[in-house]
């Protein structure tokens, strides 16, 4: 399951012709919503991207996998995403302030997951 969402985001951005660095922030928004495990939060985030019914269904299935995987799965993948963030082209594309906001968001997700 590790990297599933990252792979999905990279495939989608490649398909749409976007630079992957431009898709970093939208990826973090979607990843955060999926990992939080709350369908309402996921719906709000997906609405920003005008997701189709099939796309919503796919993201809901990924969210179910994370929920089934439990706390350990969510924390491990959040840590992987953090490491990718601080060692990726995203870091060079966005300002330091934006990267700090993303890092803060990932830490907030971890705190929320841990209760």
Swiss-Prot record:
Residues 1-23 form the signal peptide. This is Androgen-binding protein homolog. Keywords: Secreted, Signal. InterPro entries: CH2-like, Secretoglobin, Secretoglobin_Domain_sf, Secretoglobin_sf. SUPFAM superfamilies: Uteroglobin-like. One of its GO terms (cellular component) is extracellular space. Its main location: secreted. It is found in: Secreted. Belongs to the secretoglobin family. It comes from the Eukaryota. Pfam families: Feld-I_B (PF09252).
């Amino acid at each position: 399951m590790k990297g599933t969402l990252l792979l999905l985001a990279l495939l989608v951005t490649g398909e749409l012709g976007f630079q992957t660095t431009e898709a970093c922030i939208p990826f973090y928004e979607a990843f955060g919503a999926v990992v939080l495990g709350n369908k309402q939060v996921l719906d709000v985030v997906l609405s920003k991207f005008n997701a189709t019914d099939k796309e919503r269904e796919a993201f809901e299935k990924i969210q179910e996998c994370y929920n089934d995987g439990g706390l350990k799965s969510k924390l491990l993948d959040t840590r992987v995403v953090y490491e990718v963030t601080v060692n990726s082209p995203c870091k060079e594309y966005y300002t330091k302030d934006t990267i700090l906001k993303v890092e803060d968001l990932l830490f907030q997700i971890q705190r929320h997951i841990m209760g």
